[in-house]
UniProtKB/Swiss-Prot annotation:
It comes from Candida glabrata (strain ATCC 2001 / BCRC 20586 / JCM 3761 / NBRC 0622 / NRRL Y-65 / CBS 138) (Yeast). The lineage of its organism: Eukaryota, Fungi, Dikarya, Ascomycota, Saccharomycotina. It is an enzyme of class 1 (oxidoreductase). A motif (Histidine box-1) lies at residues 201-205. One of its GO terms (molecular function) is C-5 sterol desaturase activity. May contribute to the regulation of ergosterol biosynthesis. This is Delta(7)-sterol 5(6)-desaturase. The keyword Transmembrane helix applies. Keywords: Endoplasmic reticulum, Iron, Lipid biosynthesis, Lipid metabolism, Membrane, Oxidoreductase, Steroid biosynthesis, Steroid metabolism, Sterol biosynthesis, Sterol metabolism, Transmembrane, Transmembrane helix. A motif (Histidine box-2) lies at residues 214-218. It catalyses: a Delta(7)-sterol + 2 Fe(II)-[cytochrome b5] + O2 + 2 H(+) = a Delta(5),Delta(7)-sterol + 2 Fe(III)-[cytochrome b5] + 2 H2O. The histidine box domains may contain the active site and/or be involved in metal ion binding.
Length: 364
C-alpha cells in the first residue's frame, strides 16, 4: 500500500493537506505538542529547505523503514513539507488510507460487477422463483453503504504495513530463484487465505453470529454480480482478515499484494455471476457458491473445495446447473425452491424479510 500512497501523496494528497492543514498553523501550537504529534515545522529559510530536500532525496529507502521518512518512487518536493501533517503522521495516514481504500473499493466493485453484468451474467436468473423484487438495486445499495465502513475497519492493518510491521518486500533477487519464490508466494497466499475464509465463513454461520452479521448477505438466494460485496460491513471485514494476516507472518512482494487484492475482488464478483461455466471438482466456482446461497450449509470455501471436503461441508453442484435447458426447467426450479425453503426455515426460522418477484401476495 505504500507504493499506492506515495504515488497519490506526490500527485494529489500533498496539495490537499497543504490546503487543509498548512504548515503555517504550527505557529499557534506548543513545540512539545508539535514533537509529540510528529508535525511538520516551518522552514523559513529557502536555502535550508532545498538542502534538506537534496539530502533526503539522496537517501536510499530501506523497505522496512517507516513510510514517509525518505522517498522511494518519487523525490520529495517543497509541497511535501507544505502541510502541518507530514506523510508519516499517523492521523494523515489514517485518513489518506481510508479515502484510498474506500474509493478504490467502490470503483473496483462497481466496474468489475458492471462488466460482469454486461458480458458474463446469466440474465435468466431474473426469472428464478427465488429472485427478489428490486434485488439488484438492493444489492448495490447495501454494498455501497458497507464499503466505507469495511475500509475503515481495515485501515489499521494497512497502517501496520506502512510502519514496517509486515513482511512485504520490493526487491527481488532474480538470479537466485526470484521468479520461483514469487510463484510459490501466489500459491501459499491462495492456500492460506482459502483456509482463513473457510474458517471465518463457518463461524459466520453459527446461529447467533449469522443473525447478527451474515444474514444480510444470504438475503440473496440467487445472485447477480452486485451481490459480491453486499453484506454487513463487519461480516466483510472478518472474511477479509486472512488477506491482512498473511503479509504479517509470511513474505509477499508488494506488487503481488496489489495484484492479489484486485484478483480477490474479481473472484468475489465472478462466483456471484450465476454463469456456471466450470464443474471442476477442485475449484470453488460459481456453481459451488450458488449451492451455498441456495442451501446455506455447504461450500463455505472461497477458491477451492479442499477445506469443505476436509470439513465435511462440500456439496457437489447439481448437473442441472450446467445444463441451460434444465437450469430453468419448471420442475427443477420447483424442487430447488422447496429445498431452499426448508433450509430457510432451518437456518432463519422464517422468510418474512424477502419479497420475491413471483410473490403476488407480497407485491400487491
Amino acid at each position: 500500500m505504500d507504493l499506492v500512497l506515495e504515488t497519490l501523496d506526490h500527485y494529489i494528497f500533498d496539495d490537499v493537506y497543504a490546503k487543509i492543514a498548512p504548515v503555517e498553523l504550527q505557529r499557534g501550537i506548543d513545540d512539545s505538542l508539535v514533537n509529540a504529534l510528529s508535525l511538520n515545522k516551518i522552514v523559513s529559510n529557502s536555502t535550508l529547505l532545498h538542502e534538506t530536500l537534496s539530502i533526503t532525496n539522496s537517501l536510499k529507502r530501506v523497505n522496512k523503514d517507516v513510510y514517509g521518512l525518505t522517498p522511494f518512487l518519487f523525490d520529495f518536493t517543497e509541497k511535501t513539507y507544505a502541510s502541518l501533517l507530514p506523510r508519516n503522521n499517523l492521523i494523515r495516514e489514517f485518513f489518506s488510507l481510508w479515502a484510498v481504500v474506500t474509493v478504490f473499493g467502490l470503483l473496483l466493485y462497481l466496474i468489475t460487477a458492471s462488466l460482469s453484468y454486461v458480458f458474463v451474467f446469466d440474465r435468466t436468473i431474473f426469472n428464478h422463483p427465488k429472485y427478489l423484487k428490486n434485488q439488484m438495486y438492493l444489492e448495490i445499495k447495501l454494498a455501497v453503504s458497507a464499503i466505507p465502513t469495511m475500509s475503515l475497519l481495515t485501515v489499521p492493518w494497512f497502517m501496520l504495513e506502512l510502519n514496517g510491521y509486515s513482511k512485504l518486500y520490493y526487491d527481488v533477487d532474480w538470479e537466485h530463484h526470484g521468479l520461483r519464490k514469487l510463484l510459490i508466494e501466489y500459491a501459499t497466499f491462495i492456500f492460506f487465505t482459502d483456509c482463513g475464509i473457510y474458517l471465518a465463513h463457518r463461524w459466520l454461520h453459527w446461529p447467533r453470529v449469522y443473525k447478527a452479521l451474515h444474514k444480510p448477505h444470504h438475503k440473496w438466494l440467487v445472485c447477480t454480480p452486485f451481490a459480491s460485496h453486499a453484506f454487513h460491513p463487519v461480516d466483510g471485514y472478518f472474511q477479509s482478515l486472512s488477506y491482512h494476516i498473511y503479509p504479517m507472518i509470511l513474505p509477499l512482494h508488494k506488487i503481488s499484494y496489489l495484484i492479489l487484492f484486485t484478483f480477490v475482488n474479481f473472484w468475489s464478483v465472478m462466483i456471484h455471476d450465476g454463469q456456471h461455466m466450470s464443474n471442476n471438482p477442485v475449484v470453488n466456482g460459481t456453481a459451488c457458491h450458488t449451492v451455498h446461497h441456495l442451501y446455506f450449509n455447504y461450500n463455505y470455501g472461497q477458491f477451492t473445495t479442499l477445506w469443505d471436503r476436509l470439513g465435511g461441508s462440500y456439496r457437489r453442484p447439481e448437473d442441472s446447473l450446467f445444463d441451460p435447458k434444465l437450469k430453468m426447467d419448471k420442475k427443477v426450479l420447483e424442487k430447488q425452491a422447496r429445498e431452499t425453503a426448508a433450509y430457510i426455515q432451518e437456518v432463519e426460522g422464517d422468510d418474512t424479510d424477502r419479497v420475491y418477484n413471483t410473490d403476488k401476495k407480497k407485491t400487491n
